[in-house]
Amino acid sequence: MLCIAAFLVLLVLAAVSAKYRRLLGTAWRCVTRRVTFRPCDTSFREDVKNSMLAPLAVRAPRLVKPASIAIEVTAWIMVLSLVLSLYIVGKSGLNLFVYGTCNPQDTQACSLSAGACSIDAGADDFGSALAKGDVVGAFAAEFRSLGKTFDALPSRLKDWDAREYLPEAASYAGGYRDGLPVAVEVIDPGCRFCGELFRNIESAGFADEHNLAYIPYPIGPDAAPKFTNSPLIADYLTAVRLTEQDDVPAMGGTDWRILEHIFTGERPDGVAWQIWFNEQASADEAETQLQDWLAEAGYDAADINDVARLAASDRVHDIVADGKRIVEQEIRTATVPTLIADGALHPGVVSVDKLQGMR
C-alpha cells in the first residue's frame, strides 16, 4: 500500500513541480503491478520508506521499526480512505440521478437535491446501524440500499406516462379537459415541500396546461405517520373524490379546495393551516375543520356525515393503500413531492420556470 499512497502524494506534488514527475512515473509502474496483484519490479517501495526513515535512524535508531510500522499503517489508511471516498461519491451521484437526492434517507442532508420529504427517513442506514453496534445490520442496510438504487435505475431511463399511475377515482385540478396531457403528483398533505410545489404549480399556470391529478401519500405507517393528521386528510380527500365522482351535490373539485386551504391558507390567528394540522390540531379538531371546509363547498349536514362514514370505510382505506403501493412499487420514488409530467419523473420541488417549460 505504501507505493499507492506515495503515488497519490506524488500526483499532487508533480502537478506543481516538475522534479517529482520522474518519481511519479516510477510510482505509477509500481501501482499498476500492485493493483493487478503482482509484486513491484522496482525498489521504489523501499526507496520511499528509507528516505523517510533515514533522518530518524541517525537520531533515534530504536524508533525506526515503530516508525516503519506507522508508515505502513498510514499508507493503508490513506488508500482505504480514498477507496471509501470514491465509493461514497459514486453512490451519492447514482442516488442523485435515480432519486434526485444523494441521500434518500435524509433528503435535506444533501445540498444538491431539490426540496423534499424523505419517504424512508425511519429506515436504518449504515451509519445509524453501526452506531447501535450492529455491524452485520449496517452492511446489510448498505447493500440493501445500493440494491434498491440499482433496481430503480432502469425505470429512470424510460419515458414516463402519467396515465399509468393514476389512482382510483382520480380528481383533476379544474376538471378533466380533452386534449391536454396528464400529469400526476405524489403529495403528503403535511410535507411543507408539497405546499411549495403546489404554490409553484399555481404560479406557473401548470394546471391550465395539464390534466393534473394527485396521489395522497401519508409518509410512514398509519400507526406512526410522519405528519400526525396526514392519514386522516388523505382519507377525506379520497372520500370526497369518490363522492363527487358519483355526482352527490357539491360544487365539484372540493378536494382541490381543501388542498388549497392546507397548502396556501392561514388561520385567523396567522398560523398556516399546514402547520396547524401538523403541530397543533388533535384528530378531532382536524376532522372538524375538514368538515367545515366541506360545508363551505356546499355540503349539507347529511352529505358531510356520508363523507365522514366513507372516509372511515375499508373502501377508502384500500384506495389509499393502493396509492401507497403505486408510489412504493411502481413509481419507486424516495421523496415527496414527486411529479410525473412531460415524459419524465421529477422528484422534489420543481421550479416555476421548469414547470412553465413543460408541455
Residue spans for each PLM region:
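Hydrophobic alpha-helical segments
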Residues: 1-42, 46-48
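Hydrophobic alpha-helical transmembrane segments of multipass integral membrane proteins
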Residues: 8-12, 76-86, 258
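Membrane-interface motif at the C-terminal end of an N-terminal transmembrane signal
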Residues: 17, 82-99
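Cytosolic juxtamembrane regulatory segments of multi-pass membrane proteins
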Residues: 36-53, 112-121
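Loop-to-transmembrane boundary segments
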Residues: 48-83
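Extracytoplasmic thiol/disulfide redox context detector
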Residues: 92-232, 312, 316-331, 355, ...
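Structural alpha/beta surface segment adjacent to cysteine/selenocysteine redox centers
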Residues: 195-295
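C-terminal cap of thioredoxin/glutaredoxin-like
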Residues: 281-359
